[in-house]
């Protein structure tokens, strides 16, 4: 008897990359003929993602031995409750910085009967393999939508997402404004609690994206900016080591806030002059982003699930 795939989630008051990737998993699996659904406590955050997927409400979900429940890292309550149902449990780990939230001392995934862990990046997988005794972590890469056409006309403006690092955002902006009054006309465009489509529109219209990535398992915004030919300046947050190189952006250590303001100014000047260095970085960034096209994620996802249901 074929098993049902149930990705466990809950609604949040603001958008995150993790729930977006879960929706992409469910959509890809359902389109490929799998019995896959998202199980959530509410539909209240669906408007953030513009991505309808087959869904069950938690109140209507009665897990059995015929279900495979895919649970995010750190969700101890779900590990315990769903483990009692007889369902098979798999952990989808999208951020290694949160794994410890699901365990007491000396506990591991095996404590909850979990022997399979899916990770969104090699950075996350390395951590799980090394510290949690899972010998063969499965990596299913994050997927982004590569657009056939991207905005060629860019506003000389800086987009940024302050959610994880509002202090750093404010500090960098203050130093920039005080040191470079001649650039007072450069607009700073915050992307915060907007829908994914609106976030992509704002990213796409700006020449620069200030990456404030912090404690990331992968970090979607910088790679999405690259896909839109928006130049990335800032931090990779750890997980961004999956894609960040000196060829596709201007990357700094997280504490280098003043240097970040200086780099933004330098890049704006090069963009104004239309330098080859900038065009080369944009080309390389777009190429890097193409490696994470959602089709690659779907191929790996199907390979993983074909042998399990």
Task: Tell me what each language-model feature is.
Residues 214:
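Aromatic "clamp/platform" in nucleotide-sugar-dependent glycosyltransferases that forms part
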Residues 231-234:
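Short hydrophobic beta-strand element within catalytic cores of glycosyltransferases
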Residues 18-21, 126-131, 136-199:
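Conserved catalytic-core segment of nucleotide-activated headgroup transferases in glycan assembly
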Residues 1-68, 238-240, 249-253, 291-295:
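N-terminal pre-catalytic "stem/leader" segment of glycosyltransferase-like enzymes
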Residues 200, 223-227, 241-242:
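Short alpha-helical segment that forms part of, or immediately flanks, the ligand-binding pocket
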Residues 43-114:
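Extended catalytic core of nucleotide-activated donor transferases of GT-like folds
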Residues 272-307:
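A charged, aromatic-enriched C-terminal amphipathic alpha-helix characteristic of glycosyltransferases
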